[in-house]
Amino acid sequence: METWFAERPVGDLRPGDHAWLAFASGEEQSRVIGDFVFDGLNTQEKVVYVTDSRPLELPGLLTRHRIDPTPFTEVGQLRLIPLEKACRTRGRFDPDRMLATLNQEIEVAFDQGYRAVRLTADMGWALREPGGSDLMLGCEQEFEAAVAPSTMTMAICQVDRSSCSPGELTALRNTHEVLVEVNPEFDDGILKITRTFAPHGLRLEGELDGARHAVFAETLSSVAVPKSKVHLDFTRLSFIDLGALNLLAIYAMRMPGGGGLVLDNLRPDVEQVIEMVGWHRLPGISRGQGERS
């Protein structure tokens, strides 16, 4: 069965969005959840986070946005609810208790006069319990029905993708209509550059021409990791000029040993440009995954 998703940067989430994040690293979690929480605090929205973490341990707030969230917890704008209180009964995940807790928090935020409420929880721990995946599926389906028609609620359900099997991740993802991702590194309406984390690299969308070489080179340098491959996802890239290919070749040659660039999901028209130049003239650059025709 084909499933439809809206893919949205975290900064574009809006009330009614019940979003899914299966993060591949702490950095990805910080960039999505940290921005989600920060944006809510910055716009005077209520933020509810189901977690046993202390305020200074929340992803991305101190390390990325350089703010201490403690004052926001003291005035009630940021509400941290421990797992035992929010969704555990006799030490086990209790979906009914989770749903009741979140619905109550939504009602309280509305009574307090907030124009919107943001909800999030890292549920990887629940998936590791016996039968946790099935319990999570039921909980997510009911929560989707509650959030989708809302005019003031948005939520991100987050898990570490290593906490469960690919099949479980797919089933849980399919209970959401929105897939949330990091905000773009660059977007001028012609070229959009977004960080990717599994695999590590960048996704390019639109057209990469001479006017955007500098920003592309700068962004590419920012994701370099010694002795690691950098993947460039070309699925949505409709045009790349010869100057950009030359830039890639120069960059690849300068990468430390063991590094290199991998071009994933090459479109036929983009591949034709590369074939015209010749792969042998692009040392350090290799074809990656994705079919080409």
Give residue spans per PLM region.
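STAS-like cytosolic regulatory interaction modules
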Residues: 71-74, 149, 159-239, 243-293
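Positively charged, polar, low-complexity stretches
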Residues: 1-192, 272
